[in-house]
């Protein structure tokens, strides 16, 4: 089968975008997505994103397969790329103001293309109740903030946030001192996270400027994670380490994140750029 695709990237977090508006289910299997994401034998990417017909009062539906074939609830960098892709499919100019309502497995997400080329996304309010994340850390409905978690023989203070997908955030003194490749998988598969977890290691440079390394569930180390950056700001506010608006510096570049407090939406602003188009022959 021949599949037309367009590759996009948001701060180096790269995705294969497919026009799937003709049917409600993805036109590829998870195994085929794994093959496409292979950086040696395929196109290469952190995931495959499908633009599907709308559900309810939305404009489109988003589905995504990670590079390991798993399906996350949504993806922050990915939805910025999807918004750019949809504008391209609709023949909209690059410098345009347009807002989409996108149905995802995490609910309705609203990205807005801006005239300056950036994409601002209303990510909705964060989920802080342990059962909603989900995690077995903590009790009842109290947020998991600075709770100790034993990983690799060390106790880590962690804060848990869901942006529709689960995140575990830990603040450290020096990111360069972190054994990232060893710790990432151990956090991801820790038994207190029944659906596994995305993990962010954070160094606070200033209350309005935080540096972040991310280990993504199902993808491993990536250059950027939009939902992760949103979760980091929420964790920073909850722990008193950051302001309500801050720059989150990822290996691929900065995202601007804003959160006014409990019950309020988190807003993310950042780039999404087209890389190339092509045709892929599936096996």
Curated annotation (Swiss-Prot):
GO terms for molecular function: diaminopimelate epimerase activity. Its EC number is 5.1.1.7. The record marks 167, 216 as: Could be important to modulate the pK values of the two catalytic cysteine residues. Its main location: cytoplasm. InterPro entries: DAP_epimerase_AS, DAP_epimerase_DapF. It is found in: Cytoplasm. It catalyses: (2S,6S)-2,6-diaminopimelate = meso-2,6-diaminopimelate. Pfam families: DAP_epimerase. PROSITE patterns: DAP_EPIMERASE. Keywords: Amino-acid biosynthesis, Cytoplasm, Isomerase, Lysine biosynthesis. Substrate binds at residues 13, 66, 76-77, 165, 198, 216-217, 226-227. The active site is at 75 (proton donor), 225 (proton acceptor). Catalyzes the stereoinversion of LL-2,6-diaminopimelate (L,L-DAP) to meso-diaminopimelate (meso-DAP), a precursor of L-lysine and an essential component of the bacterial peptidoglycan. Belongs to the diaminopimelate epimerase family. Homodimer. This is Diaminopimelate epimerase.
